[in-house]
Amino acid sequence: MCDEAVWAPQAAALAGHDCRVATHGLLDSLTLMARKALDEAPPGRLSVAGHSMGGRVALEMQRLAPERVERMALLDTGFAALPAGEAGEREKAFRFGLLATAKSRGMRAMAADWARGMVHPRRLDTPLFESVLDMLERSSVMQFEAQIAALLARRDASAQLPGIGCPTLVLCGAQDGWANVAQHEALQRGIAGSELVVVPDCGHMSTMEQPEAVSAALLRWLAR
């Protein structure tokens, strides 16, 4: 659902690096997304950063081709599978409810509901919030449906974490309501030698909400 706009501040700050933003089209599997990103990336070793669902794609890239992933940054993301039982059913109902809104009222109407939990409360109904809505509106209902399918079928990466040996940054907003700090603390504990950065005054859309802090963390990570 996110496009190049989510990384625009970092692309400017990292202008000395070859920064590319992967696209997933109508792919409905995180593994297929990871394979496409690997196939379309330049040959050789890569510094892979992923935000939200993209963090899960980054983990899949590392699982599929660990020899190609030189370092990894996981932003505002998760590593667990869909919960069993009632929690999983609630997540399904929530996501399918959003999809129904997108189909009946359009992507922007859906985004206006969904994105209210994505940013720090003080950024609601601000130009930044509108830019998030603009970005989500650029996606199609079919893309949204495909990404829901991918996320509901997500793999539990817990067993993968101890084997990750590349320099890894784990970053989230202190007020991320979608992927909370405790979730990122668990992710950081699972990856030996990884660094945890919690960005103050920041929700889920860290790259857009606190671009300077995120860019600074990425520059430190690239220097490792």
List the predicted regions and their residue ranges.
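Acidic beta-to-alpha connecting loop that harbors the catalytic carboxylate
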Residues: 1, 174-176, 201-203
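Conserved HGGG/HGGXW glycine-rich cap/lid loop of the alpha/beta-hydrolase fold
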Residues: 1-35, 46
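Gly/Ala-rich beta-loop-alpha elbow adjacent to hydrolase catalytic centers
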Residues: 50-54, 58
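Flexible "cap/lid" loop of the alpha/beta hydrolase fold
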Residues: 63-64, 68-105, 109-112
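Conserved alpha/beta-hydrolase catalytic His-Asp/Glu region
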Residues: 86-87, 104-163
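Short beta-strand/loop motif that positions the catalytic acidic residue
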Residues: 164, 170-172, 176
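Catalytic histidine neighborhood in serine/cysteine hydrolases
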Residues: 181, 185-204
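Catalytic histidine-centered segment of alpha/beta-hydrolase-like enzymes
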Residues: 202-215
